[in-house]
């Protein structure tokens, strides 16, 4: 949509400066292939209070973010905005391809819809926030900043990012609901097996 292109052009013309560039570069690098979320999730596994959170995050990132990256994007095949507009293209090429700072330049064959950075950020933020409610505000701030980098550097349309936010929150919530039900079922199964063993011993 033309309004999305105009919005991205406006961001470049009005918000870009060396300080913001440095900060946004770092954030968008951390979101590459969701590696930072996997790293934190694996750390969660080592602590009893966060183990369940870690398992839920890893499962969601693999299944949902992975599906978006390897399947969903190729269903829609939406071309990235900087490939549709000469002004955006010239900016990205000058900024990234000839510099490749932090290796954040999207591959030539990658598609735009929906934003994987945004989806992963809000999946992770939603799951962690539900299990650890006190972390809600910082989680959502970080996820929002991560998502904004995809607009600050015109790798995605605004609607790509909005879709990533909504999908991340929805499936993050669904992941927790499913995980809680599975946990209850597993606990019941374990208790049932223990009871059967006790009954067999008593006989």
Task: Provide a role label for each language-model segment.
Residues 1-38, 69-105, 194-203:
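N-terminal transmembrane-helix/juxtamembrane module of multi-pass inner/ER membrane proteins
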Residues 19, 49-54, 82, 131-138:
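Membrane-helix interface segments
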Residues 24, 52-60, 135-138, 159-163:
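Alpha-helical transmembrane segments of integral membrane proteins
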Residues 37-48, 121-129:
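Hydrophobic, aromatic-rich transmembrane alpha-helices
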Residues 40-71:
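Interfacial segments of alpha-helical transmembrane regions
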Residues 44, 68, 72-77, 129, ...:
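Membrane-water interface at transmembrane helix exits
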Residues 59-75, 136-150:
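Small-polar-interrupted transmembrane alpha-helices in polytopic inner-membrane proteins
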Residues 96-203:
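Membrane-embedded catalytic cores of phosphoryl/pyrophosphoryl-handling enzymes
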């Amino acid at each position: 949509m033309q309004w999305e292109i105009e919005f991205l052009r406006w961001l470049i013309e009005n918000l870009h400066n060396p300080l913001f560039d440095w900060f946004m570069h770092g954030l968008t690098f951390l979101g590459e292939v969701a590696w930072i979320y996997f790293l934190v999730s694996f750390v969660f596994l080592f602590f009893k209070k966060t183990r369940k959170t870690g398992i839920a995050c890893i499962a969601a990132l693999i299944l949902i973010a992975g599906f978006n990256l390897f399947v969903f994007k190729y269903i829609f095949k939406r071309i990235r905005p900087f490939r549709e507009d000469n002004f955006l293209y010239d900016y990205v090429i000058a900024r990234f391809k000839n510099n490749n700072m932090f290796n954040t330049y999207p591959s030539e064959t990658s598609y735009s819809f929906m934003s994987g950075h945004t989806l992963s950020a809000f999946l992770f933020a939603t799951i962690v926030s539900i299990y650890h409610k006190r972390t809600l505000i910082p989680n959502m701030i970080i996820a929002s900043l991560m998502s904004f980098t995809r607009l600050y550097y015109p790798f995605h349309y605004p609607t790509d990012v909005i879709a990533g936010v909504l999908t991340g929150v929805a499936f993050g919530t669904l992941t927790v609901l499913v995980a809680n039900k599975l946990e209850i079922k597993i606990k019941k199964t374990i208790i049932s097996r223990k009871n059967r063993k006790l009954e067999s011993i008593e006989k």
